[in-house]
Amino acid sequence: MTNIRKSHPLIKIINDAFIDLPAPSNISSWWNFGSLLGVCLAVQILTGLFLAMHYTSDTATAFNSVTHICRDVNYGWLLRYLHANGASMFFICLYLHVGRGLYYGSYTYTETWNVGIILLFAVMATAFMGYVLPWGQMSFWGATVITNLLFAIPYIGTDLVEWIWGGFSVDKATLT
């Protein structure tokens, strides 16, 4: 008698993808973090789109729009918490993914490793922009402290910071 997971047409697809996956037997759970990064990124994009439908970035109404999302939108509180905690999970998975690469010596593949480093910097820059733009007074602090690190660059640091800020100081709590 044949096993149902190998004979049933629908269960066979799941069996081939998850149970009898043609992968080496010595692969460990450390190799899941790339897939988890994809899941976290998809959750971030979807929840971010739904939150952006109700968010107002004006300094006078930003807090009211967040309370509207949490109170009046169906499962708005869940979207907000998934988005906030999903960002933390994304970076945890990202750092574990890099740590796995360091542990297994993936840095010897220089082209692949350099692409990963560029992606890491792009993710950090994107996260910085997401942190700085909408959050009110916390973004004043974040923008000032983090971008002031650029002042340490010799000769161009001052001009670079003023270019990023768009002037001599950060103007408002949000971009509007």
From Swiss-Prot:
Keywords: Electron transport, Heme, Iron, Membrane, Metal-binding, Mitochondrion, Mitochondrion inner membrane, Respiratory chain, Transmembrane, Transmembrane helix, Transport, Ubiquinone. Binds 2 heme b groups non-covalently. Heme 1 (or BL or b562) is low-potential and absorbs at about 562 nm, and heme 2 (or BH or b566) is high-potential and absorbs at about 566 nm. Its main location: mitochondrion. Component of the ubiquinol-cytochrome c reductase complex (complex III or cytochrome b-c1 complex) that is part of the mitochondrial respiratory chain. The b-c1 complex mediates electron transfer from ubiquinol to cytochrome c. Contributes to the generation of a proton gradient across the mitochondrial membrane that is then used for ATP synthesis. It is found in: Mitochondrion inner membrane. Its cofactor is heme b. GO terms for molecular function: metal ion binding; ubiquinol-cytochrome-c reductase activity. It comes from the Eukaryota. The keyword Electron transport applies. Gene3D superfamilies: Cytochrome Bc1 Complex, Chain C. The chain crosses the membrane at residues 33-53, 77-98, 113-133. One of its GO terms (cellular component) is mitochondrial inner membrane. CDD domains: Cytochrome_b_N. InterPro entries: Cyt_b/b6_N, Cytb/b6-like_sf, Cytochrome_b_N_euk/bac, Di-haem_cyt_TM. Heme b b566 binds at residue 97. One of its GO terms (biological process) is mitochondrial electron transport, ubiquinol to cytochrome c. Heme b b562 binds at residue 83. The cytochrome bc1 complex contains 11 subunits: 3 respiratory subunits (MT-CYB, CYC1 and UQCRFS1), 2 core proteins (UQCRC1 and UQCRC2) and 6 low-molecular weight proteins (UQCRH/QCR6, UQCRB/QCR7, UQCRQ/QCR8, UQCR10/QCR9, UQCR11/QCR10 and a cleavage product of UQCRFS1). This cytochrome bc1 complex then forms a dimer. This is Cytochrome b. The lineage of its organism: Eukaryota, Metazoa, Chordata, Craniata, Vertebrata. The gene is MT-CYB. It is a multi-pass membrane protein. Belongs to the cytochrome b family.
